[in-house]
A protein has these predicted regions:
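N-terminal Lys/Arg-rich, disordered targeting/topogenic segments
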Residues: 1-6
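Solvent-exposed, non-transmembrane regions of membrane-associated and secreted proteins
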Residues: 10-208
Length: 208
């Protein structure tokens, strides 16, 4: 009986040890996978809007067949790339804010709006893993720069304010007198179904 109990304790100990390793490395592996996936998406998106030596834009039809059937097929609904140098952030923007969209990138809450003209709301998950998705969004401060690259142009926005609202206060997405970028994520991080939203608003400063 004692032998069986000892074996059971050892088995339980092994299980707990394995679980410990799983939780220790899971977040790191998840971040590595997401980073690799984003690199592929960004590379594919930029190939659509890049310029050849002759100065003409490279069209999707000119990209290799293997790319069109692989990476480029993942770009359905892609609107551009959001870069935030201050927090080492770079992800692809997709139409909509469904769970599927937010699982692979940043969601454009109202796809009918135009970047550089309207107040464009971009939603992202607040991951608990450092540096993943909008995890570090709360670090942004006044005058920090956000960049959105589309196939048509590159837009630079300057952060003008950060604040917290209730998740029902959708007025933050209303158009203003000037083009805005409004980043939206849950807060605080790590809380299940939080009622508050962290908002970062930035004004357009350049378009090229």
């Amino acid at each position: 009986m004692r032998k069986e109990e000892a074996e059971l304790r050892r088995a339980i100990g092994v299980v707990f040890l394995l679980l410990g390793f799983f939780f220790l490395f899971h977040s790191k592996l998840e971040k590595l996978f997401l980073d690799h996936h984003q690199e592929e998406l960004i590379e594919a998106f930029e190939s659509l809007g890049s310029t050849s030596a002759s100065g003409q834009a490279i069209l999707a039809s000119e990209v290799q067949i293997s790319d069109r059937e692989g990476k480029l097929s993942l770009l359905d609904g892609a609107r551009g790339i959001l870069r935030i140098p201050e927090i080492d952030f770079e992800m692809v923007i997709f139409d909509g804010a469904s769970e599927d969209v937010l699982g692979k990138g940043i969601g454009m809450i109202e796809p009918h709006k135009e970047i550089g003209i309207n107040n464009v709301g971009l939603a992202g998950h607040r991951s608990t893993t450092f540096g993943k998705q909008f995890n570090r969004l709360d670090e942004l401060e006044h005058h920090d720069i956000l960049e959105v690259k589309t196939e048509e142009a590159t837009y630079e926005f300057e952060v003008v304010k950060t604040f917290i609202v209730d998740r029902t206060e959708v007025e933050v997405l209303e158009d203003a007198n000037a083009p805005l970028l409004t980043l939206v994520t849950c807060t605080p991080a790590g809380v299940k179904d939080p009622t508050d939203r962290l908002i970062v608003q930035a004004k357009l400063i350049t378009e090229r």
